[in-house]
């Protein structure tokens, strides 16, 4: 599947997907957030994020070919299409929490 600019923008539009992709630029592989926050003793918000990662965000990035995800090992690696999104990620390092909330001039 050839990814379009819209696909790349959709991939980084969510903070959790963006954080995972940015983390992979620094360290490949990563452990998925779901594995780290899935325990019942975690705050509800963390468990909700874990569920979103497992059922929405990581599968979306897999479908795009941007990551490879080994659910059993809770390991995320760069996918076959990852190099195509790297130029976009390169302009985001100072904006890991938001693309539009930065109020600096």
Whereabouts are the PLM-identified features?
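Short acidic, hydrophobic short linear motifs in intrinsically disordered regions
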Residues: 30-46
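Short, Lys/Arg-rich nucleic-acid/phosphate-binding segment
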Residues: 71-76, 82
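Residues in the recognition helix of alpha-helical DNA-binding motifs
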Residues: 57, 79
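Short alpha-helical segments that sit at the start of domains
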Residues: 1-27, 32
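A short, conserved structural fragment
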Residues: 58, 62-72
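Short, amphipathic alpha-helical interaction segments positioned at domain boundaries
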Residues: 83-105
